[in-house]
């Protein structure tokens, strides 16, 4: 999983990317391409 300061560019990488909030963190998940997984923050 990648950790980024901003998810704006990662959100638009693939049409199957979804933005999800879990436990106060923001994640981008993609069930078709798991390598697109990203988390915001340190």
Curated annotation (Swiss-Prot):
SUPFAM superfamilies assigned to the protein according to its UniProt record, in alphabetical order: Ribosomal protein L36
Record flagged with keyword Manganese: no
Keywords: Ribonucleoprotein, Ribosomal protein
Pfam families: Ribosomal_L36
Cited HAMAP family: Ribosomal_bL36 (MF_00251)
Family: Belongs to the bacterial ribosomal protein bL36 family.
Protein name: Large ribosomal subunit protein bL36
């Amino acid at each position: 999983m990648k950790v980024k300061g901003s998810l704006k560019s990662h959100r638009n990488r693939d049409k199957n990317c979804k933005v999800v909030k879990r436990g106060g963190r923001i994640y981008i998940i993609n069930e078709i391409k798991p390598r697109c997984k990203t988390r915001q923050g340190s």
